[in-house]
Amino acid sequence: QSKYYGIQVVVGEATQKQVDGFAFLELDLICVLGKQKPELVFGLLGGSELLQQPHFTTLLENHHRMLSHYRHQEWEEAMAELESCRLVSREVMGCPALSGLYLLYQQRIEEFVKTPPGPGWDGVYFAESK
């Protein structure tokens, strides 16, 4: 999944919770091929030095708001937060490029604006491959 998100290291929620002192960013709520239950996945972006940067804290807050709007089908708000994330992520020293991740969400949002997922959608992305 790392290639899909443009992040070198992608881990599940259980792994993310067991590791302290590293900078993680929630990437998606995903249901992989062959599984029934969706799982939160996270990208490992760096170590403790990244966690201590004020811009990284701002990025986490903006990213969380973007995902919340996305999962509530608030497309305009999600897109606005996405743009904020793009800007802030460039200010975070030592943070890997997140342009691929935000392009992915931009494309999903644009598609959902054209073809809404429906009122029962819970924000889960169904991966077509493992």
List each model region and its residues.
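Intrinsically disordered, low-complexity, charge-biased linker/tail regions
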Residues: 117-130
